[in-house]
Amino acid sequence: VIFVRHDQRQSDELRAIRVQRHFTGAAPGSVLIQAGRTTVLCTASIDTTLPPWKAAANPAEAVGWLTAEYSMLPGSTSPRKKREREKMDGRSTEIQRLIGRSLRSTVDFKALGPRTITIDCDVLQADGGTRTLSITGGFIALCDAIASIRGDLSPERPVITRSIAAVSVGVVDGVPVLDLDYVEDSQAEVDLNVVMSGEGEFIEVQGTAEGKPFSREFLNQQLDLATKGIAQLARFQREALGPEWPFK
């Protein structure tokens, strides 16, 4: 029996992905990325200074850094989400740390030199998978930002060492499914977020049983789905970047 989801996708089918690069003019990397109804603006900015703790830790080495910030705009969800001003909620803090950790795994910081890259991910519309879409879009924005300073970098030592993308997987009505939207996520018996390189290596796996525990077999099935989905996302990133794809 073929399991058909509420939006008519197959169990192993991603939502439709759309990307608009150079969406804004101020940041050297700027990407509007959509997966179904979920929409995130990812920008990458480059500063020629380092955080004080980073500069103090490596006074003799010109080693760069990457950090990330994540926020959901008030109108991105219903009911309205209160705007984060002085203090971020725990969820946003956790997500931006995940985005930062993931994207740092792609960068050779010695090749970058004494620069700080900031990835800003602002959710314009939330329908599930905002953190994973932020990573996938954030990588595209990162590539465009690095391309903007190519003339200041050594051609012998690439700054970006691997591609990464991320996707959610879960179990809905007893069936492992790929790329959950909000309806599915709210009903999921198991919820995983998987970050992988374009070569198929795992960078981070976050998983939770929402009710009863799940078996190793179900875990393997979900990781297989994630591997398939991320391979598709990596191809999409390559097509979106075109000549700016950092790997020849």
Question: What are these model-predicted stretches?
Answer:
Residues 1-27, 31-34:
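Short, Gly/Pro- and small/polar-rich lid/capping loops
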Residues 17-20, 26-29, 48-52, 104-106, ...:
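Glycine-rich, charged/polar anion/phosphate-binding loops
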Residues 18-20, 32-34, 41-43, 67, ...:
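Structured core elements
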Residues 23, 28-112, 200-202, 206-219, ...:
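Glycine-rich, flexible beta-strand/loop modules in the N-terminal catalytic cores of phosphate-handling
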Residues 29-33, 130-137, 141:
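Conserved phosphate/anionic-ligand binding catalytic regions in large, soluble enzymes, centered on
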Residues 84-88, 121-130:
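A short glycine/serine-rich beta->alpha loop
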Residues 89-94, 128-136:
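Short, conserved micro-motifs enriched in small and acidic residues
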Residues 111-114, 129-133, 143-147, 153-248:
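A structural signal for small-residue-enriched, beta-sheet-centric alpha/beta enzyme cores
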